[in-house]
Swiss-Prot record:
Tissue: Expressed by the skin glands.
Any one Pfam family match given in the protein's UniProt record, by short name: Antimicrobial_2
Family: Belongs to the frog skin active peptide (FSAP) family. Brevinin subfamily.
The protein's name: Brevinin-2R
Membrane-spanning residues: none
Residue runs in coiled coils: none
Organism: Pelophylax ridibundus (Marsh frog)
Main location: secreted
Lineage: Eukaryota, Metazoa, Chordata, Craniata, Vertebrata
Length: 25
């Protein structure tokens, strides 16, 4: 369960980072 939670957090962080990089936020 903890691994799944960490994966979800990392995924959302990646999504935020790529959205900022592409300037589409």
């Amino acid at each position: 369960k903890l691994k799944n939670f960490a994966k979800g957090v990392a995924q959302s962080l990646l999504n935020k980072a790529s959205c900022k990089l592409s300037g589409q936020c």
